[in-house]
Amino acid sequence: MSAYRQPVERYWWARRRSYLRFMLREISCIFVAWFVLYLMLVLRAVGAGGNSYQRFLDFSANPVVVVLNVVALSFLLLHAVTWFGSAPRAMVIQVRGRRVPARAVLAGHYAAWLVVSVIVAWMVLS
């Protein structure tokens, strides 16, 4: 005799917003992997010389690649925002025996993200 297994709908997670957000965050790892691969391809093309880099730029101008990168960017932002949102729950920081407010932890993470983004933009654009 086997245990009773209650049937579960295929898209059970789409009914509640919190479950949907969780599933979208989990799916975002695919797009994070795409960006890592894309950046490695950029580095390889730059290292191989001007012709290789031009071929990569032509590949990147393909409308399918542009749409994929826009979708990937939106998922990457979702991934980053939800990652930072979990930080105050994962990091219990105490100063003088009192817990640091969640907003302060979030502000620190977003400030660090902004500083790193400005530095990277400065390095790339200058």
UniProtKB/Swiss-Prot annotation:
Q: Which domain of life is it from?
A: Bacteria
* Topology of this chain in the membrane: Multi-pass membrane protein
Question: What is the stated purpose of this protein?
Answer: Anchors the catalytic components of the fumarate reductase complex to the cell membrane, binds quinones.
Q: Which CDD domains match?
A: QFR_TypeD_subunitC
HAMAP family according to UniProt? Fumarate_red_C
Q: Which UniProt keywords apply?
A: Cell membrane, Membrane, Transmembrane, Transmembrane helix
Subunit details for this protein?
Part of an enzyme complex containing four subunits: a flavoprotein (FrdA), an iron-sulfur protein (FrdB), and two hydrophobic anchor proteins (FrdC and FrdD).
Annotated Gene Ontology cellular components are: fumarate reductase complex; plasma membrane
Q: Which family does it belong to?
A: Belongs to the FrdC family.
Q: What is this protein called?
A: Fumarate reductase subunit C
